[in-house]
Amino acid sequence: MAKGARDKIKLESTAGTGHFYTTTKNKRNMPEKMLIKKFDPVVRKHVEYKETKIK
């Protein structure tokens, strides 16, 4: 069976709270690391989330 183009990734908060989201991304169309602003419920603000690998 062929391997898909999408990888599971973890978006971790840069606020240092330890909060994270999981999502998928197409590694062929977007090889660079993602940096997205999302809501962090621990600090109750929108902060940047950086892409990290799922362990």
Curated annotation (Swiss-Prot):
<dbReference type="GO" id="GO:0006412">
    <property type="term" value="P:translation"/>
</dbReference>
<dbReference type="Pfam" id="PF00471">
    <property type="entry name" value="Ribosomal_L33"/>
</dbReference>
<comment type="similarity">
    <text>Belongs to the bacterial ribosomal protein bL33 family.</text>
</comment>
<dbReference type="InterPro" id="IPR011332">
    <property type="entry name" value="Ribosomal_zn-bd"/>
</dbReference>
<dbReference type="GO" id="GO:0022625">
    <property type="term" value="C:cytosolic large ribosomal subunit"/>
</dbReference>
<keyword id="KW-0689">Ribosomal protein</keyword>
<protein>
    <recommendedName>
        <fullName>Large ribosomal subunit protein bL33</fullName>
    </recommendedName>
</protein>
<dbReference type="InterPro" id="IPR001705">
    <property type="entry name" value="Ribosomal_bL33"/>
</dbReference>
<keyword id="KW-0687">Ribonucleoprotein</keyword>
<dbReference type="InterPro" id="IPR038584">
    <property type="entry name" value="Ribosomal_bL33_sf"/>
</dbReference>
<dbReference type="GO" id="GO:0003735">
    <property type="term" value="F:structural constituent of ribosome"/>
</dbReference>
